């Protein structure tokens, strides 16, 4: 969805049901135009088919992203379909996660360079630093992939990792970024290796 896409009011902290697209989806469940409408319709079909519990995992860069996703989707569905909202209370989990990996915006020159180097025609590549940390709250509705085998950290509470990232990592990235840029670096991890 992206960190700014949850339709949560900065003033009240509540999901904004009066958004025009959200209002459309509440009235037209079978013809959604928002992420909330599409997910709700998918969950409605899952419920109708008798399929079991499911986890919705947010990897967006905001604190308590699972709690934010839960608030947004539960408020939306509660306004659209009370029966589905009750089913979700019993069958859908929204774990929190923390992802640390810088992914700068991709520019047209980046796309051209990648395609020339690799002989590809990728119109939407994602550039990122080599470092990655992915911490996931172990709160899944019906089992989960063994992500820890590929480096993810599973935990009961992501909060300590989020606080560490904000207070230590983000501050040090900011402190290091300015002299690194002046030194010719365009990635913080490259400057740290020097």
Label each residue range with its predicted role.
Residues 1-194:
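Substrate/ligand-engaging "lid" and interaction regions
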């Amino acid at each position: 969805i992206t960190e700014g896409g949850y339709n949560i009011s900065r003033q009240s902290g509540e999901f904004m049901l009066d958004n025009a697209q959200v209002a459309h989806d509440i009235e037209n469940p079978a013809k959604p135009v928002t992420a909330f409408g599409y997910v709700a319709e998918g969950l409605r079909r899952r419920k109708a088919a008798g399929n079991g519990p499911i986890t919705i995992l947010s990897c967006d860069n905001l604190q308590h992203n699972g709690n934010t996703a839960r608030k947004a989707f539960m408020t939306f569905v509660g306004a659209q379909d009370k029966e589905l909202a009750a089913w979700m209370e019993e069958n859908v989990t929204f774990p929190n996660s923390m992802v640390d990996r810088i992914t700068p915006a991709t520019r047209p020159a980046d796309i051209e360079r990648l395609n020339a180097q690799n002989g590809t025609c990728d119109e939407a590549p994602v550039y990122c630093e080599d470092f990655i940390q992915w911490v996931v709250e172990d709160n899944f509705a019906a089992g989960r992939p063994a992500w820890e085998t590929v480096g993810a950290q599973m935990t009961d509470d992501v909060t300590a990792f989020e606080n560490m990232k904000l207070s230590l990592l983000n501050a040090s990235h900011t402190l290091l970024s300015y002299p690194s840029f002046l030194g010719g670096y365009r990635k913080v991890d490259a400057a740290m290796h020097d």
